[in-house]
A protein has these predicted regions:
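Glycine-biased, small-residue-rich flexible motifs in mid-sequence functional cores and linkers
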Residues: 1-156
Length: 156
């Protein structure tokens, strides 16, 4: 199961790739279920809601707020066995997810170049839970070795 935030960029790609591979996906959104953000993800959100799962910690009609996205990221840390970083910036909301993973004792997989760029990945509480990778192939191998993932030919 791929759990991601339905944001533009890698989140969208993660959801679409999971579905294309016949897997399952969970979208944890930073808005209430009656809203889509970004708006051009409304059809994807509806498709995930129909065939997979969309989760929100916010009641219907809740106005959008910037603090919703760190809350969404912390919720993803609680739902997932591990977090795989692909991209993040110095002020990225992903740091909230990584911090929550560390507090929960969950693993974080991150590319070496992010470790070299981001101070928040070097914190003493995050470091013991962090595994670095250089290539996407190495990331896949690390995840497969670290997590109890059942591989099947098809999903029902």
């Amino acid at each position: 199961v791929v759990i991601s935030g339905l944001a533009a960029g890698i989140d969208r790609v993660a959801h679409e790739a999971a579905m294309a591979a016949g897997g399952r996906t969970i979208a944890v959104i930073g808005t209430s279920l009656d809203r889509a953000y970004p708006k051009d993800h409304a059809a994807l959100q509806a498709r995930i809601a129909e065939d997979h799962l969309v989760v929100s910690p916010f009641a219907a009609g809740t106005p959008m707020s910037a603090w919703h996205f760190p809350k969404r990221n912390r919720l993803m840390a609680h739902l997932a066995q591990a977090t795989v970083l692909i991209e993040a910036g110095a002020t990225s909301g992903t740091r909230h997810q990584v911090s929550a993973c560390a507090a929960l004792g969950r693993q974080v997989f991150a590319p070496v170049h992010l470790l070299e760029q981001l101070d928040w990945l070097q914190s003493a509480k995050v470091r013991p839970h962090l595994q670095a990778w250089r290539t996407h192939e190495e990331a896949v191998q690390l995840v497969l070795e670290a997590l109890p993932i059942e591989r099947t030919a098809s999903h029902s």
